[in-house]
């Protein structure tokens, strides 16, 4: 085959793929931007937020304001360049630019850095024009001499005030260029001091640790270089002003990047005390080549503001995710109660055994039955078979149909585990196509979990994966896929491309992943998908736009999950957060907990069961059946309501408590947990939030009780101001309380 012709076809296909939108999601309810020609100021007013920017005398587009909503006639602008401080910091060098190129006298962190084939690395972006179309503002910045246009796109969600920003970088010159780094946006906070940063870190089985640090002169870098989102850092941040963090009050600016590949968010404070947050593609090993006429579009970087503290910042993000990010928006189905058979069987799955588990699950009230790893290919352990997505006829002699029919007959939907992006070297797929994995020719291929990463940037690999998944869904009546991803990248080569084009793999891979998910959803609209990556290593607003739920962690220990879920909900909605009840003692840490504690912990998200049901006693079955029935009466409130975090479990704190309130405020659900009893310290009084103060709420206990003298009914004001004292005693005690408006 002609190598040059092959490379040309691959380049054409890649260019077409990168021209597509990043992810399909419900359209946000956008506020209409405004432009004042006299002051040269652009303004977005949405929710309780105003965002404004203006063009200064030298053509720089500068941030003017981001904060609480202002009156429509309040003056903003004109923009002024930063004054000269010395010859080391000349005029304009530290201006609050919306999207700065690296060029001229700029010393602040640029949003875009490029180099040209003639050796030039100077890029000075100046305002050119704007358009407003269907609630979206597009501003064109241009370096006419270099032949580079950058189109900045802004949307503002009317309900939450959350702003979406992205950039399209186009080579309009006559020579190729290479993008060294490309951000989606730079957010400039109001001038001031005493800012503090929050972010999320973790590792496998220990995701979602909430970190806090003061912002001081210099830089803090949050990133993934791993090819995917990762659990090391998550592409989310929150910044407050005033030092102390509070759930209920205080200024908080926050943001999240909609990208499932390698990413970076950098927080800078410059010598003037100006705080900036710049985020987008990770520039590490980036080197993205643009020929004349080619363009690159960044992911969307969302940002918001509230004066209502960290709790309200989370609730705004949750509402935005539910209405504008997750598929189906307000019309999305509630997460069904799920059973997954992995803990019961691991790789030893077969038709008869799965049917027995299905019968047990259905008797508990489970609504979805999922067969995990081991149903396909020569898959008897994690050493072989991955990539061969055909039913193992030894385990399922008549295919999946008998099991699927059994599950449907038990009034449950049916799901399967898949890991399409990976392959075992010991597989038919790899033996046929060893060139399909990420690799550098003649170099060792590093394995993780005995598997390699397929190069989804290749159009033939993308086509193959869509074909086999489409065939699986077409031939079997499947309603759910648990889409896993169990390792990071290594040797990220793309030998089929020209050497100067190979680093496009980071962007093209993620675009093609999105395209597969999008096309599967379009062709099989009844199939729901969960994003899983050995737990929570692929959770971001990009993949969430194309999946219905996410798996926060492989750690299902009920006590550890309190901290995991607390960290997760800082940024992401419980509507997408799956949580399982598994065995005791925990396989993760050998900690024993009661079935009551395990159910109440898992009921704070989408409830699942992953224990070996064949080991449960009749008493266990009865307990589980009761909790499943109780959960169905409150899940709309838990999944679609507003979440209030009352007691934080972070840092191995002894207590945890949350309450959720339905949109109409007719129901509230309180969960309280005591990990460790402490001598002479009673469980704290819990004062609920979000209730209707004038309404009366009757109390019903799912589990646990209040101290003697607690009323059966009282006003919302009473429960929020006086509170409730729960009778929690001993280690790993818990309570679940429902408040119903009378």
Regions found by a protein language model. Name each.
Residues 103-123, 242-262, 304-329, 366-373, ...:
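Glycine-rich, aromatic-flanked loop segments that form ligand/cofactor-binding clefts
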Residues 676-742:
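C-terminal beta-sandwich/jelly-roll accessory domains of carbohydrate-active enzymes
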Residues 48, 167, 293, 339, ...:
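Conserved, mostly hydrophobic/aromatic
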Residues 28-35, 39-43, 51-52, 61-268, ...:
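Polysaccharide-binding surfaces and accessory modules of carbohydrate-active proteins
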Residues 112-114, 122-127, 288-307, 732-739:
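Short Pro-Gly-centered flexible turn/kink motifs
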Residues 330-467, 480:
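Aromatic-lined carbohydrate-binding/catalytic grooves of carbohydrate-active enzymes
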Residues 397-399, 431-433, 437-596, 606, ...:
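Active-site neighborhood of glycoside hydrolase catalytic domains
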């Amino acid at each position: 085959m002609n190598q040059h012709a092959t490379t040309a076809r691959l380049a054409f296909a890649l260019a077409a793929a990168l021209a597509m939108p990043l992810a399909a999601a419900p359209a946000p309810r956008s506020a209409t931007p405004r432009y004042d020609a006299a002051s040269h100021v652009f303004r977005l007013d949405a929710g309780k937020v105003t965002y404004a920017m203006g063009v200064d005398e030298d053509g720089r587009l500068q941030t003017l304001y981001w904060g609480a909503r202002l009156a429509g006639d309040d003056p903003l602008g004109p923009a002024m360049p930063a004054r000269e401080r010395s010859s080391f910091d000349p005029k304009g060098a530290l201006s609050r630019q919306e999207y700065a190129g690296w060029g001229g006298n700029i010393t602040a962190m640029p949003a875009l850095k490029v180099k040209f084939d003639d050796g030039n690395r100077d890029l000075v972006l100046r305002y050119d024009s704007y358009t407003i179309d269907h609630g979206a503002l597009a501003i064109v910045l241009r370096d006419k001499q270099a032949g580079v246009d950058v189109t900045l796109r802004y949307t503002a969600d009317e309900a939450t005030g959350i702003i979406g920003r992205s950039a399209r970088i186009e080579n309009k010159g006559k020579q190729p260029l290479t993008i060294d780094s490309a951000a989606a946006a730079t957010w400039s906070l109001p001038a001031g001091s005493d800012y503090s940063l929050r972010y999320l870190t973790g590792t496998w089985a220990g995701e979602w640790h909430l970190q806090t640090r003061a912002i001081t002169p210099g830089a803090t870098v949050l990133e993934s270089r791993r090819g995917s989102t990762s659990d090391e850092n998550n592409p989310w941040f929150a910044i407050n002003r005033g030092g102390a963090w509070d759930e209920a009050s205080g200024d908080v600016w926050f943001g999240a990047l909609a990208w499932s590949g390698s990413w970076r968010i950098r927080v800078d404070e410059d010598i003037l005390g100006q705080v900036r947050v710049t985020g987008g593609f990770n520039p590490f090993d980036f080197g993205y080549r643009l020929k004349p006429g080619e363009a690159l579009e960044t992911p969307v970087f969302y940002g918001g503001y509230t004066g209502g503290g960290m709790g309200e910042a989370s609730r705004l993000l949750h509402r935005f995710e539910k209405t504008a990010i997750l598929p189906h928006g307000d019309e999305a189905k509630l997460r069904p109660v799920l059973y997954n058979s992995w803990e019961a069987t691991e790789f030893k799955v077969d038709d008869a055994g799965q049917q027995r588990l299905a019968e047990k699950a259905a008797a508990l009230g489970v609504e979805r039955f999922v067969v995990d790893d081991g149903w396909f290919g020569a898959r008897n352990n994690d050493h072989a078979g991955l990539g061969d997505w055909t039913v193992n006829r030894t385990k399922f002699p008549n295919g999946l149909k008998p099991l699927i029919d059994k599950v449907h007959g038990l009034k449950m939907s049916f799901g399967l585990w898949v890991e399409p992006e990976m392959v075992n070297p010991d597989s038919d797929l790899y033996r046929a196509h060893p060139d399909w994995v990420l690799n550098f020719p003649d170099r060792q291929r590093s394995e993780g979990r005995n598997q390699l990463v397929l190069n989804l940037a290749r159009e033939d690999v993308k086509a193959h994966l869509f074909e086999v998944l489409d065939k699986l869904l077409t031939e079997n009546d499947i309603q759910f896929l648990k889409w896993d991803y169990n390792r990071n990248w290594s040797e990220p080569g793309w030998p089929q491309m020209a050497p100067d084009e190979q680093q496009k793999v980071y962007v093209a891979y993620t675009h093609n992943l999105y395209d597969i998910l999008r096309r599967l959803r379009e062709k099989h609209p009844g199939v729901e998908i969960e994003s899983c990556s050995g737990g929570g290593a692929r959770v971001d607003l990009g993949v969430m736009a194309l999946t219905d739920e996410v798996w926060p962690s492989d750690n299902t220990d009920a006590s550890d999950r309190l901290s995991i879920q607390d960290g997760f909900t800082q940024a992401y909605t419980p509507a997408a957060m799956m949580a399982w009840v598994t065995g005791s003692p925990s396989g993760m840490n050998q900690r024993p907990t009661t079935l009551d504690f395990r159910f109440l912990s898992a009921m704070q998200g989408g409830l699942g069961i992953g224990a070996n049901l064949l080991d449960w006693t009749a008493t266990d079955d009865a307990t589980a059946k009761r909790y499943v029935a109780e959960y169905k009466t409150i899940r709309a409130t838990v999944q679609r309501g507003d979440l209030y975090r009352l007691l934080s479990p972070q840092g191995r704190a002894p207590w945890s408590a949350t309450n959720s309130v339905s949109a109409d405020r007719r129901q509230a659900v309180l969960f309280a947990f005591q990990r460790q009893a402490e001598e002479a310290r009673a469980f704290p009084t819990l004062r609920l939030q979000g209730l209707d103060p004038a309404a009366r709420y009757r109390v019903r206990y799912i589990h646990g009780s209040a101290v003697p003298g607690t009323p059966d009914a009282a006003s919302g004001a009473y429960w929020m101001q006086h509170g409730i004292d729960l009778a929690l005693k001993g280690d790993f005690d818990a309570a679940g309380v429902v408040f119903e408006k009378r």
